[in-house]
From Swiss-Prot:
Signal sequence coordinates: none
The keyword Cell membrane is assigned to this record: no
Protein name: Protein N-terminal amidase
Gene giving rise to this polypeptide: nta1
UniProt record similarity statement: Belongs to the carbon-nitrogen hydrolase superfamily.
Active site (catalytic residues): 43, 121, 155
Any single GO CC term annotated in Swiss-Prot or TrEMBL for this entry: cytoplasm
Biological role: Deamidates N-terminal Asn and Gln. Component of a targeting complex in the N-end rule pathway.
Organism expressing this protein natively: Schizosaccharomyces pombe (strain 972 / ATCC 24843) (Fission yeast)
Enzyme Commission number, as recorded: 3.5.1.-
Alphabetical list of InterPro entries matching this protein: C-N_Hydrolase (IPR003010), C-N_Hydrolase_sf (IPR036526), Nta1 (IPR039703)
Coiled-coil residue spans: none
Length: 286
């Protein structure tokens, strides 16, 4: 099964311009994307990330029930064109009884353009807290047609909660383990999960980062945060789609990659540099 992760430098608040550049990027990789089954885009892919408050992000919020939802519409067009599942990050608002709640979200779109699931970022980074509400919990879908078990997570979700929880608590990785244990109790035929990480992850060190290479420190850290899965010999596919570039005071690290967790090891099947627009594609047994 073929998977892809998109790495992109969005311009803050320039949604239409970002869509144009993303289409160009997809066109440049159209041959590699043929027969891809799942394509993952970064966190807040069309809007950019570094909004300082709810007022500044207000014009870019999307409601999935609205006719005007650029991120969902773009992902649906991608899914239709490549006949694939698509995951995309976007800033969301929901209305209930006249009250708006804002979320940092990802959406899963089917090859038939169906909106299958929307996930709300559970662990918020400092920038998110200026406008977003914390999601109620992590995400695990036990059986998506053709894909099997899948989990969407967003950036800070794999960190210790609020950077205050014990490092060894490994909240997200242990959540996946518990979900898999439950699925194995229900069925003896559970395929390995696909862990989809949409990111706006910062560089590990502004002073030493080499933009012509992957950010190896971050790559190692992401693997470490999934170590309970590795140490338990859990087989999984990990798709990391991270943005790159500098946005005001934040510098993002790229290094989008495809990893396989198998027999107690993390195997890298493809990785992009810290500073480039690109799509990493890999084919793995599901």
């Amino acid at each position: 099964m073929k998977f892809g992760c998109v790495q992109f430098f969005p311009k803050l608040g320039k949604v239409n311009e970002n869509i144009v550049h993303l289409r160009q990027l997809l066109d440049q990789h159209s041959e590699a994307l043929q027969s891809v089954k799942l394509l993952v885009f970064p966190e807040m892919c069309l809007t950019g990330y570094n909004f300082k408050n709810s007022e500044s992000i207000q014009p870019f919020l999307e409601n999935v029930t609205s006719n005007h939802c650029p991120s969902i519409q773009f992902a649906q067009e991608v899914s239709e064109q490549y006949r694939c599942y698509t995951i995309i990050g976007f800033p969301e608002f929901q209305n209930s009884n006249g009250i708006s709640t804002l979320y940092n979200s990802t959406a899963l779109i089917s090859p038939k353009k169906e909106l299958l699931n929307v996930y709300h970022k559970h662990f918020l980074f400092e920038t998110d807290k200026s406008w977003a509400t914390e999601g109620k919990g992590f995400s695990f879908e036990p059986c998506i047609p053709e894909l099997g078990p899948i989990s969407m997570a967003i950036c800070m979700d794999i960190n210790p909660y609020d950077f205050k929880a014990p490092f060894e608590k490994f909240e997200y990785a242990n959540f996946i383990l518990r979900e898999l244990e439950h699925q194995q109790m229900v069925s003896s035929n559970v395929s390995r999960p696909i862990i989809c990480l949409s990111m706006a992850w910062l560089v590990s060190d502004d002073k030493v980062i080499d933009a012509s290479l992957p950010d190896i420190k971050n790559l190692h850290y992401w693997t470490t945060r999934l170590s309970p899965l590795i140490n338990s010999n859990t087989d999984a596919i990990v798709l990391v789609a991270n943005r790159w570039g500098k946005e005001n005071d934040l510098n993002f690290s790229g290094t989008s990659c495809i990893m396989e967790l198998s027999q107690g090891r993390a195997i890298l099947h493809g990785v992009l540099k810290a500073a480039e627009n690109g799509i990493v594609v890999g084919e793995l047994e599901k």
